[in-house]
Amino acid sequence: MKTDYEFLKTDIDGHILTVTINRPERMNALHPPAHAEFDEVWNEFDKDENLWVGIVTGEGDRAFSAGNDLKFQAEAGGKMDINMASSGFAGLTSRFNLTKPLIAAVNGVSMGGGFEIALACDLIVASTNAKFALPEPKVGLAALAGGMQRLPRQIGMKNALGMMLTGRHVSAEEGKSLGFVNEVVEPENLLSAAKAWAKQIEECSPMSIRATKQVAYENFNEPDLEKSMKAHYSAVKELFGLSLIHISEPTRLSLI
């Protein structure tokens, strides 16, 4: 994977990829060139068999991401491209076929599209100074990058509407209470805490993890348990269809 991105920083530690939004002067808000870089990064992450877990965070402690770069939009004459890459905001929010787990390490502001990036991840680790919101209705917009769909699925309709209809800011601790934050840590411990989660995942079979994620997501809204358990899943078929397995460490399976 290349490392010379203009608006992102990438780091690889073992099987873990960390992607940092590197626009602190814009509160890590995203504009079209940043979206394009994200799309490229996640494409590479998806196809690289040596990368098993991803972490996304923001440079500095002020913001994970303030969402859409409204200043850039104003400078461009007010045009807003809602038809970005098919993979969505940050190349992620409409990327529904990614079976590798992603962790959002949220530092500071996570607003609008920034919150939607975090919601598109599988786990959220937040610093004590993190603030979450979908404030689009306050400025006559709507959370079009999956926020209106993902938040009710993750915390229930009443809790989600309580956030979405008011645009109110939610602290990391309240986010944990509501159920969309997995862990709250001090700002100086944020990245190490996210990496600790990633390391635990890394200790598992990557193919088992992918199968688990696929089944969990594809059956989230399936009310028929029997139908869910009898369904066919490509990642499960791949996992149990192996003809040659090498056990290199306890509980870890890898292809030869």
Regions found by a protein language model. Give the residues of each.
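Conserved CoA-thioester-binding segment of acyl-CoA-metabolizing enzymes
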Residues: M1-D61, S243
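Single conserved hydrophobic/aromatic residue that forms the stacking wall/gate
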Residues: I245-I256
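Well-ordered beta-strand positions
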Residues: L123, G162, T166-R168, E174, ...
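C-terminal long alpha-helix characteristic of the crotonase
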Residues: V125-A130, V181-K230, S243
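CoA-thioester-processing core
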Residues: F89-T99, A105, M111-L165, A193, ...
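Glycine- (often His-adjacent) and acidic-residue-rich active-site loop
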Residues: K2, G58-N97, V139-G140, F220-P223
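Short, active-site-adjacent cap segments at secondary-structure transitions
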Residues: D61-S65, M111, A133, A216
